């Protein structure tokens, strides 16, 4: 599967795109050689003498990723593993495998253990959301300590399909339906990470063949077959049902839709530079005079660049309500004990103090 994205240096004739190019990855996987053009293009964007963090769970995909990176000459790797403490001895065995792999390769390995279930309960989040939050906080901590801000992840095309479907049924706009980018930026705890997903255009089947061919050791997460997690239900129930209803593999169509949404998203991102900034916020009059669709996009971009967690168009709607209101100064609540306030013709954000209270 090749979605041939042409933004952020990921497609078209840009020679820097090939780290994430399906054609080159397939060449590596099936021919056991690195094409000279591939090697040169990788070095031009992601030099092999730089350091990279690699998220390694011990599962099939991340162990294949680790093998791939090593076989293509990436030696300055820091393995990052999170023990979610969800599966008892099984979680500990995952950690042991990753640590053993790091030792055998002579690579540093950073490990973090966290009671994800307890964190989920305390923060009123799903297990999936809590685990993701813990992982990225850990990644940002390692990135800050090691001064290495490039993180390589093992997401593949099947993961992309699941992500697109989840976002679609949540009512996401083009940003959500476009799925994950092969190369993107994410700010966590004021640390800007560059996320790199070399396998995003490869199917799970292709990775399975690679693992089998190279006899790569990995741990099978049996919880992937359980249905408590939304992503598992999407993978195990919804996708097979859709394939049966449409009598075809739905992956190409979903990825094609994601690509079209990505192009629309690309245009919208170009408009985000037009944020009507004023003092420490945004100019209310300018926002009121914008077309609704553009204003929604700009407000969402503003929230995300400001580090407001878990924000979407529902938060944008709340801000729009106080924005267009003719009442005196108005305020609305946002996730993470943040607030948006309109006062004296300026829309601005209030942030919690170190204790998470008393927004300032």
Residue ranges and their predicted role:
Residues 2-10, 14-62, 78-84, 114-116, ...:
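AMP-forming adenylation/ATP pyrophosphatase catalytic core
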Residues 24-237:
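Core alpha/beta nucleotide-donor-binding catalytic domains of modification enzymes
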Residues 124, 128, 251, 313-316:
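Short, structured helix-loop boundary elements
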Residues 143-157, 252-269:
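Electropositive, surface-exposed helix/loop patches at the edges of structured domains
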Residues 146-148, 245, 310:
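Surface-exposed helix-capping loop/turn segments at secondary-structure junctions
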Residues 241-253:
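Inter-helical turn/loop segments and adjacent helix faces that build the functional surface
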């Amino acid at each position: 599967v090749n979605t041939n994205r042409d933004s952020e240096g990921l497609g078209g004739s840009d020679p820097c795109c090939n780290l994430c190019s399906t054609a080159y990855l397939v060449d590596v996987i099936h021919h056991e050689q690195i094409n000279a053009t591939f090697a040169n293009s990788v070095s031009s964007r992601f030099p092999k003498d730089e350091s990279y963090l690699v998220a390694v769970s011990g599962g099939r995909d991340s162990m294949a990723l680790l093998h791939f990176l090593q076989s293509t000459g990436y030696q300055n790797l820091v393995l990052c593993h999170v023990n979610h403490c969800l599966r008892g001895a099984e979680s500990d065995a995952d950690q042991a495998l990753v640590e053993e792999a790091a030792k055998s390769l002579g690579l540093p390995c950073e490990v973090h253990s966290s009671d994800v279930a307890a964190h989920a309960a305390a923060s009123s989040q799903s297990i999936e959301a809590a685990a993701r939050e813990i992982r990225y906080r850990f990644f940002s901590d390692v990135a800050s300590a090691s001064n290495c801000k490039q993180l390589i992840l093992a997401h593949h095309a099947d993961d992309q399909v699941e992500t697109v479907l989840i976002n679609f049924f949540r009512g996401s706009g083009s940003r959500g339906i476009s799925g994950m980018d092969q190369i993107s930026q994410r700010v966590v705890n004021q640390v800007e990470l560059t996320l790199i997903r070399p396998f995003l255009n490869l199917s799970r089947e292709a990775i399975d063949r690679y693992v089998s061919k190279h006899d790569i050791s990995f741990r099978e997460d049996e919880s992937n077959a359980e249905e408590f997690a939304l992503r598992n239900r999407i993978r195990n129930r919804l996708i097979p049902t859709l394939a049966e209803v449409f009598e075809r593999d739905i992956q190409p169509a979903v990825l094609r839709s994601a690509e079209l949404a990505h192009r629309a998203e690309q245009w919208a991102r170009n408009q985000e530079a037009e944020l009507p900034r004023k003092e420490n916020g945004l100019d209310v009059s300018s926002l009121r005079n914008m077309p609704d669709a553009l204003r929604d996009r700009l407000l969402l971009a503003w929230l995300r660049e400001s580090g407001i967690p878990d924000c979407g168009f529902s938060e944008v709607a709340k801000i729009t309500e106080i924005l267009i209101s003719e009442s005196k100064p108005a305020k609305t609540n946002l996730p993470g004990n943040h607030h948006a306030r309109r006062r004296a013709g300026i829309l601005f954000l209030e942030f919690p103090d170190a204790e998470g209270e008393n927004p300032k």
